[in-house]
Amino acid sequence: MNNLITISGKKVNLIANGDLQILNDPWQIFQLNDWALRKDFEMITAGRASQPIPATNKITGVANIFLEEGAVVEHSILNASAGPIYIGKNAQVMEGCMIRGGFALCEGAVLKMGSKIYGATTIGPHCNAAGEIKNAVMFGYSNKAHDGYLGDSVIGEWCNLGAGTTNSNVKNTAGDVKVWSNADNDYISVGLKCGLLMGDYSRSAINTSFNTGTVVGICCNIFVPHFPPKFISDFTWGEERYTFAKILQDIGNWKRLKGHSVTKKEEEILKHLYNQ
């Protein structure tokens, strides 16, 4: 199947086998996640056998559940009747978790005790996740390690949501949610549901409450005594500008917790963006 698409103003002919989805906006990541999970599950598990599912778990839809080598799942409820459940290599589902597919817990990630997961949700590699999560995507090395609600949301890499952080995903009026778009330089309607869109390396303080359709840029440290604004620009420290030296120091601190460090390439990219 040939598809003519536009990338950075240039027409590109893309050849693909099967269904093709083009992501134009970040909120489409969670909107299309159910489709993506099903496609990925089918591709990744084709011709392979799951590791045995321990008998301590309560299982529905066993044919739609796949555990990679080293995955640990004990004393939890897994219901794959509405969508597949994939537990990656060396990932861990702690006791008392309740999971409804579609769901992917990627390599080395941890789902903490008593978590409640609704599809379609993806927890990226080496993330920590807890609380109530619904139709959300967390990219690698990010943490939502405590109670709180995350729904219809996208969290970038190396983010941290403090204990009790919660987002709204539906307006009290049940009307269309408007989200800030850098491309349009304006708020645009994205549908009835949208929670939090957070860029890489950003963090929230404990008990932060995000309004419906909040956009947080990269490298933000959010701690305010009120509801944060619906659009928080890149490199924000509280309500001020983050200094670049402090950004690198804080990112380095968080990366060391997971055995990593800030690379030269990361520093160059962040410095370029900081100076825009």
Locate each region found by the language model.
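Glycine-rich hexapeptide-repeat left-handed beta-helix
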Residues: 113-114, 120, 126-276
